[in-house]
Amino acid sequence: KKVYSFLKLKGCLPRNRFCNALSGPRCCSGLRCKELSIWASKCL
């Protein structure tokens, strides 16, 4: 659990545009995580 929380605070995973978040689908914009919209698979 400590590893997951650390990665969540860090932001984007290396070599991956998606964030390591278990709460739901998210994508990265730079080094920050943004939630995906419900109706589309694009970042808000």
Swiss-Prot record:
The protein, known as: U2-agatoxin-Ao1s
Annotated keywords: Disulfide bond, Knottin, Neurotoxin, Secreted, Toxin
Family as reported in the entry's similarity comment: Belongs to the neurotoxin 01 (U2-agtx) family.
SS bond partners: 12-28, 19-33, 27-43
Propeptide feature: residues: 1-9
General function of this protein: Insect active toxin causing rapid but reversible paralysis in crickets. No activity shown in mammals. Does not show effect on mammalian voltage-gated calcium channels.
Domain of life: Eukaryota
Organism: Agelena orientalis (Funnel-web spider)
Main location (coarse class): secreted
Domain notes: The presence of a 'disulfide through disulfide knot' structurally defines this protein as a knottin.
Tissue expression: Expressed by the venom gland.
Cellular component, GO annotation: extracellular region
Subcellular location: Secreted
Species classification: Eukaryota, Metazoa, Ecdysozoa, Arthropoda, Chelicerata
GO molecular function, one term: toxin activity
